[in-house]
Regions:
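A generic structural signal for secondary-structure junctions
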Residues: 14-15, 87, 103, 151-157
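Residues lining the SAM
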Residues: 111-114, 140
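A structural micro-motif
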Residues: 67, 88, 135, 182-183
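S-adenosyl-L-methionine-dependent methyltransferase catalytic module, highlighting the catalytic core
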Residues: 19-26, 36, 57, 81, ...
Length: 230
């Protein structure tokens, strides 16, 4: 595949993207973002950016909570699906160059988008730029320690996704947040093993014991909550 075809891979599968996503992963990420990271943050009336909106589940969840949502992705078909689902405002843009004014969002949500960008640290800086002072960035992304396993699964055609994937390491993600001027409030792991194994019930027992402990950096995915300081 060419670099461009990898960049726009998810745009090419926009009509079937949701059916290819794993339900257990989607459920857990929605919980992580809304029930955990934003549990103490009322969204009613808040301006929220869903960066890497995909087919719109996170946009819809934010709208349901009363937020004024902008759904952003790199492809027009993805944005169209997200806005149709959520009733949100759509923007087509690269996360590394948003084209939005500084300080215009109270909350920025980005779930499993960062790894698909050409420059993850640059994308974090852009997400931070459009945050208001005291605004929150809530981000989930795969952990780099699992990159080799995922690439092997892709080569063996065990997973349906062929887009650009550059996983970010635990420490690198914290450094990217710091370089963007953000204060990291929470950084934890989720999915103790690949969700494709179908051991969701067992994962829910094991995960709380590992998510914020010394082994958190070994988990499949990671979540960050960061604030833009005054």
């Amino acid at each position: 595949m060419t670099s461009r075809s990898r960049e726009f891979f998810y745009e090419g599968i926009a009509d079937r993207f949701e059916g290819l996503d794993h339900p257990a992963d989607v459920r857990r990420r929605l919980e992580v973002v809304f029930a955990e990271c934003l549990a103490q943050t009322p969204l009613a009336g808040q301006r929220v950016l869903d960066a890497g909106c995909g087919y719109g589940l996170f946009s819809a969840a934010a709208v349901e909570r009363g937020a004024k949502v902008v759904s952003l992705d790199i492809g027009t078909r993805l944005v169209a699906r997200a806005t149709a689902r959520a009733g949100s405002h759509g923007v087509v843009a690269d996360a590394c160059q948003l084209g939005l004014r500084d300080g215009c969002f109270d909350v920025v949500i980005s779930s499993e988008m960062l790894e698909h960008t050409a420059a993850p640290a640059g994308a974090v800086a852009e997400l931070a730029r459009v945050l208001k002072v005291d605004g929150l960035l809530v981000l989930t992304t795969p952990n780099r320690v699992w990159q080799g396993t995922v690439r092997a699964a892709s080569r063996l055609r065990l997973r349906p996704f062929r887009g650009r994937e550059s996983f970010v390491g635990w420490g690198r993600l914290e450094r990217a947040c710091a370089a963007a001027g953000l204060d990291v409030l929470a950084h934890f792991g989720f999915h103790p093993w690949p969700f494709q194994l179908g051991l969701e019930r067992a994962a829910r027992v094991v995960e709380p014991r590992l998510a914020r402990g010394p082994a958190a950096w070994l988990m499949v995915n990671q979540a960050v909550v960061a604030r833009k300081p005054r």
